Each structure stands twice: as structure tokens, then as C-alpha cells.
């Protein structure tokens, strides 16, 4: 019965994705993850991607809203206190929603997804979700301040570092490994303000992958080359900033979060 419910939950989540009903999609994937955990089996590639897409869309829209509102507040600060007050109220609502979704993802990954013995044995699966943990702690770090910022940044760093250690066994062109390097470098640049380390991670991943591009399988070619392009774009942007030539745009994370 659980298996039938699981398949039905995935079907519903897939339809919700097509209909862009991401709240429904997240709810359906929470059920699918719970059922998979009860049966002690890990999510297949389709299921883990559905889980990722559901929360990516819920969180990405809030991140965009938060940035837009903060930008608007900056323009009006010192000019119109009453409007700034309204903007602050709206920012608070968006932050609460964003943090709630992040905490939801982190709890699901820790409690259900990575707690299974099989999950620890599957290296790519393990790295995929450790990276995801790092990403969602990073999203929290974008909006929280003070001691909480330090705490979530520390958790993000630990998740990315653990994933990076495990990813050493994967080929340099593996898209999960490349996506991890991309997001870990963005974390160093945007959260830790360490441009040197960010560039080092991005350049190292790009250079290693370029050396083995000829061995890249057709299955992974599109994903891997896309992430390599994003690594190169970030390197160009970051080095230009260091030279004082460019201002503005943020570094690009992997395609799952754009």
C-alpha cells in the first residue's frame, strides 16, 4: 500500500510541477519522502529532482522578493520613513516564509532522507543532499543577522565541506560534483566575503573538468558543460570586481537554484 501511495504522490508532484503549483508539489513530496523512509528506500533520481524543484521554486521566489524589497528600502531610507516602515513589515513577512521553507527542507533531509543506512552508502545521493543542506543554510545566511548568521553560516560550511570530501571519489566532470563546487564557491564569495577562496574553488573545479572533457559521457554532457560555463562566468565576474571594473550582479549558483 505504501508503495502505491508513494507512486501516486510522485505522479501528483509531477503534475503540480507542470501546473506550477509549488505549494502542492512540496506537500506531495513531503508525503513521498515520508513513505520512502517508512519503506527504508532512498529516492530515485526523478523523486529527488521533484523534491529539489518544489522547494527551489518556493524559496527562489522569496529570495527574489526579499532582494527587491531591500533594494527599494535602500532607495527610500532617510527620505520617507512611513514608506520604509511598510517595506520593513513586508520584508519581515517574506523572511519568515523563506526561513520556514528552509527549515522544512533541512529537517526533511536530516530526519528522513539522510538518516537511512542506504543513503550513506550511495555516494552521489549523499553528496546531492549534503550540498542541498549547504544551499538552504546559505539561503538562511542571506537574510539573518548577528549570532544566528554566524551559526547558519557554520552549518552551511560544514555541509559543503563534508560533501566536498566525499566528492573526491567522483570524476571532475560529474555534474553533482561540479554543482557542489559552484555553490560552495558562491558561499565563500557572498556569505564569507572570501573572494580568494571562492575563485580558488571555482578555478580548481573548472580546470580539472576541462582536462577530462573528452571522457564526459553523453548522459552528463549538457549538465556538466552548463555548470562549467557558470563557473567560468563567476570567475570572470569576481576577478573583474577585484580589479575594480565591475559592480552589481551576484555570482550564479547551479541551475537548480536559478
UniProtKB/Swiss-Prot annotation:
Organism taxonomic ancestry: Eukaryota, Fungi, Fungi incertae sedis, Microsporidia, Unikaryonidae
Organism whose genome encodes this protein: Encephalitozoon cuniculi (strain GB-M1)
Family: Belongs to the 14-3-3 family.
Entries under InterPro entries matching the protein: 14-3-3, 14-3-3_dom_sf, 14-3-3_domain
UniProt xrefs under PANTHER family: 14-3-3 PROTEIN
Name listed for the protein in its UniProt record: 14-3-3 protein homolog
UniProt-listed Pfam families: 14-3-3
Amino acid at each position: 500500500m505504501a508503495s502505491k501511495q508513494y507512486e501516486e504522490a510522485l505522479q501528483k508532484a509531477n503534475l503540480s510541477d507542470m501546473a506550477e503549483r509549488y505549494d502542492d508539489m512540496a506537500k506531495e513530496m513531503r508525503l513521498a519522502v515520508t513513505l520512502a523512509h517508512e519503506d527504508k528506500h532512498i529516492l530515485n533520481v526523478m523523486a529527488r529532482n521533484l523534491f529539489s524543484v518544489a522547494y527551489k521554486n518556493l524559496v527562489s521566489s522569496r529570495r527574489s522578493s526579499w532582494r527587491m524589497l531591500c533594494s527599494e528600502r535602500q532607495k527610500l531610507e532617510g527620505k520617507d520613513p512611513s514608506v520604509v516602515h511598510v517595506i520593513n513589515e513586508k520584508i519581515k513577512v517574506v523572511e519568515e516564509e523563506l526561513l520556514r521553507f528552509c527549515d522544512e527542507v533541512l529537517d526533511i533531509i536530516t530526519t528522513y532522507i539522510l538518516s537511512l543506512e542506504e543513503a550513506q552508502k550511495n555516494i552521489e545521493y549523499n553528496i546531492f543532499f549534503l550540498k542541498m543542506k549547504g544551499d538552504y543554510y546559505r539561503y538562511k545566511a542571506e537574510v539573518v543577522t548577528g549570532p544566528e548568521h554566524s551559526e547558519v553560516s557554520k552549518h552551511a560550511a560544514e555541509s559543503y565541506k563534508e560533501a566536498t570530501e566525499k566528492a573526491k571519489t567522483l570524476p571532475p566532470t560529474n555534474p553533482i560534483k561540479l554543482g557542489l563546487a559552484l555553490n560552495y564557491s558562491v558561499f565563500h564569495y557572498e556569505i564569507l566575503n572570501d573572494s580568494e577562496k571562492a575563485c580558488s574553488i571555482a578555478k580548481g573545479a573548472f580546470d580539472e573538468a576541462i582536462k577530462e572533457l573528452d571522457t564526459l559521457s553523453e548522459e552528463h554532457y549538457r549538465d556538466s558543460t552548463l555548470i562549467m560555463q557558470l563557473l567560468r562566468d563567476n570567475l570572470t565576474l569576481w576577478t573583474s570586481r577585484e580589479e575594480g571594473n565591475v559592480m552589481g550582479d551576484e555570482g550564479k549558483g547551479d541551475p537548480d537554484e536559478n
